[in-house]
Every structure is written in structure tokens, then in C-alpha cells.
Regions:
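C-terminal motif of bacterial Sec signal peptides marking the signal peptidase cleavage site
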Residues: 14-17
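Sec-dependent signal peptide recognition
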Residues: 2-9
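Short boundary motifs at domain starts and secondary-structure transition points
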Residues: 25-32, 75-76
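Bacterial lipoprotein signal-peptidase II cleavage site
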Residues: 19-25
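An acidic, glycine-rich "communication" segment
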Residues: 127-139
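Helical hinge/lid and interdomain linker segments adjacent to catalytic or ligand-binding clefts
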Residues: 46-129
Length: 139
């Protein structure tokens, strides 16, 4: 009898738990907005790398892509995109083309939780590589 009572209480607890409505405030909404990606097209970027990056992003219907320049970054384009991609080319030239203020704008953009991808020289640009002109995102 004791075992039957315990099993009945366990069954009852399970039924009550399954019938409690979900708390919708804890569920995360899935965005239906496209992910807006800016591909850096500044001095030092290899045109083929820029074109191929843009073409690759266009394959995903849930993404919108545009090319951005140093002037665009200075004019706050980062406020209207979700991620930035720095493609391959000459990292030193890209570094110099961005300048100190735009480099800081990119750091601030990333610190807000926005996305950043560096491809080839762009990856070095984001790195902390000794003896290389880089933004030093890691410190």
C-alpha cells in the first residue's frame, strides 16, 4: 500500500508539472529580421577577397550584405549592422586606412556583442600578433 501511494503521488506530481503552462517571458524570440553584415572595402583589401566574401554571404537568404568604407565607419554605419567582416589583403594597409578612431569604433562595436570576422589579413588585423600592425582585440 505504501509503494502504491508513493507511485500515485509521483504520477500526480508528473501530471501537474506537465500541465503547467509555459512561462512565455522566459522564451527567447527568434528574430525574423535578416542579419546585416558589412564587408570592409577599404584601402588594402584585396578586391577578389571582398567580392568572394560578399558573394558567399549572399548565398544565405537570412543575411543582407553591403560593403563599407572607412568613411562609412566614421559616419556610424556600425550602428546599422550586426557584424563586420574584414577580408584578406594587406593588413598593414587596412590598419593604416582605418586609423585610430575607426579602430576604436570597431572595438566598441565588438564590445557591444556585435559580430566580427577576420579573413586572412583581416584575422591578423584583429589579433594580438607581435611585430604586426593589429587592433589587438585580446588586450
Amino acid at each position: 500500500m505504501k509503494t502504491t501511494s508513493i507511485l500515485f503521488l509521483a504520477y500526480l506530481a508528473l501530471c501537474v508539472q506537465c500541465s503547467v503552462p509555459e512561462n512565455k517571458s522566459t522564451k527567447k524570440e527568434i528574430s525574423t529580421q535578416p542579419i546585416k553584415v558589412g564587408v570592409f572595402d577599404g584601402h588594402g583589401g584585396a578586391q577578389t577577397c571582398i567580392w568572394e566574401t560578399v558573394a558567399a554571404i549572399r548565398l544565405d537568404p537570412e543575411m543582407e550584405v553591403c560593403t563599407i568604407t572607412t568613411a562609412d565607419i566614421a559616419n556610424n554605419v556600425l550602428d546599422s549592422i550586426d557584424a563586420i567582416i574584414i577580408p584578406g589583403g594587406s593588413g598593414k594597409s587596412q590598419y593604416l586606412n582605418l586609423g585610430t578612431l575607426n579602430q576604436q569604433r570597431i572595438k566598441d562595436f565588438i564590445s557591444k556583442g556585435k559580430g566580427a570576422v577576420g579573413i586572412c589579413a583581416g584575422a591578423y588585423l584583429f589579433s594580438n600578433t607581435p611585430d604586426y600592425t593589429c587592433i589587438q582585440l585580446n588586450g
